[in-house]
Amino acid sequence: MQKMESDESMHIIDIREDYEVQTGMLKGAEHIPMQTIPDHMHTFRQNEPYYIICAHGVRSEKVTGYLRDHDFEAYNVTGGMAAF
């Protein structure tokens, strides 16, 4: 987690619901709820890494696949926030 929070070149996208992020987020993460990802696609940049996180890694795996299908460099944070 410390590596993820200290690297300013990475984009951490927290896709959890509003009520879920009230318990805390990774430092530097941007909150974009899962269902609004398509509306925010224009803000993502090609060839930059995006690390997608949710509560347990299930929803983030789906969003990671969606972003990859649209040619973005996306990575699932396995285990999600529960892993931290």
Predicted feature residues:
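Rhodanese-like catalytic fold shared by cysteine-dependent sulfurtransferases
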Residues: 1-11, 17-49, 58-84
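Short, surface-exposed ligand- or partner-binding patches at beta-edge/loop junctions that are enriched
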Residues: 53
